[in-house]
Regions:
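Sec-dependent N-terminal signal peptides
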Residues: 2-13
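Intrinsically disordered, low-complexity terminal regions enriched in Ser/Thr/Pro/Gly
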Residues: 18-271
Length: 271
């Protein structure tokens, strides 16, 4: 995952803070999220190597007799100097709303390259209803922090390899995989390898640990010298109802640095 990061890459197209449409389209409930289907992320600050996930609802699209909607998204990303760093071709797609209603969930994914300079980046998008030709422009900013050791691109998946996204709220009896990357670590001068310790601990809604001891992993080998990051993850079974916090702490023993990421998760009863 971290061997091919470009300056910045858009993985999908989608909008940001809701602004009024020129016609009947609006974008509502816009927020940064922990992964594609995760809960709301409270901040807009990201380290190089991280992924900006944006979720929203599109309201007012023309719905066909079979529940189909057709729309186009255009996107541009600029850096702190207002220089365009990514501008893909506009994408037109058809989605379906078989359960009815007037809202279509949408998402955006933007990867902050490991070489991206710190500063405020701006994401500009335009969503157009192909049936009515009504459009809505949107602008969203996010801050790229200076390059440093950390945990990046935290998300949940249904599979161990991270190919099928999952929500961070699950039904008791189900299981998700929490995926993330360790980035920008130092290397031991003798071995040319990182020396990173990862600690994983779960806490309940009252802030109490759910088990007595944390999961501890150490990474000292197997990372090619041209890599600035490596993936990691673990399985998380939902065994009881409640709200919980997954605390992941990574320590770079070579650089004597540590980084902590907290991911809220929840389990609900089946049925």
């Amino acid at each position: 995952m971290y061997s091919t990061f470009a300056l910045i890459t858009a993985l999908s197209l989608a909008p940001a803070p809701g602004q009024p449409a020129t016609g009947g389209i609006t974008l509502t409930n816009v927020r940064n999220t922990h992964g594609e289907l995760g809960g709301t992320r409270p901040d807009n600050k990201f380290i190089p190597g991280d992924v900006v996930f944006v979720a929203f609802d599109i309201e007012g699209l023309t719905v066909g007799p079979k529940g189909d909607v057709k729309y186009t998204m255009a996107m541009e990303v600029t850096d702190k100097n207002n220089k365009t760093i990514f501008k893909p071709d506009a994408a037109t797609r058809t989605d379906y709303m078989p359960l009815g209603g007037s809202k279509l969930p949408g998402r955006a994914f933007i990867t902050c390259g490991l070489d991206l300079e710190p500063g405020t980046c701006t994401l500009k998008l335009v969503v157009t209803d192909e049936a009515s030709k009504q459009s809505v422009p949107l602008t969203r900013t996010f801050e790229v922090l200076k390059k440093d050791f950390g945990i990046a691109a935290v998300f949940a998946s249904q599979d161990e390899t991270g190919n099928i996204p999952a929500a961070t709220t699950g039904v008791v009896g189900s299981m998700i995989y929490v995926r993330y990357g360790i980035v920008n670590f130092a290397r031991d001068p003798a071995t040319k390898q990182p020396n990173v310790m990862v600690e994983i601990m779960m806490f309940d809604e009252e802030g109490k640990p759910t088990v007595k001891e944390s999961i501890v992993r150490e990474y000292k080998s197997g990372v090619p010298e041209d890599r600035l990051g490596f993936p990691d993850g673990f399985a998380l079974p939902f065994t009881r109802v409640g709200k919980f916090t997954v605390k992941i702490k990574a320590t770079d023993k070579v650089a004597n640095k540590s980084y902590t990421f907290e991911l809220p998760v929840a389990a609900v009863p089946p049925g």
